[in-house]
């Protein structure tokens, strides 16, 4: 049996409706769980970027990426191990404002985790933390001890450490688009 590990897929595409559904369907048909999914514009005008995190074997990720590459409107798909990328997630926490009145405990927690206060309202405080999943989870566990109203974490955003492969491909796509 192949060992599972975490891979980050980066898919470059044109902005077409229905593509997200096709990509998700392609993955879920294989009974693969999507850990996180983020879609945004890329550095190239008119090109969108999907960042998908999967925990599977390398053999399976190669097949998934090959299938995604065959989709109409997909320009190119890549996969990376965690050591090949720089990645972060953002988390928001809504905690009771009363927690702020109990001395400096909450302030110390926020500083310890390199988080920041985004908003203070009459009933709650919104705290933001950017980091890896284990870091945002650690802050969540601290806030659970003092009370938390709400928690949400984004999907992964990632940039590839090695530039050559991606830059060459994007340059070839840009040249191809200009020729058409």
Positions of the model-derived regions?
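Long, contiguous binding/interaction regions
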Residues: 1-49, 53-180
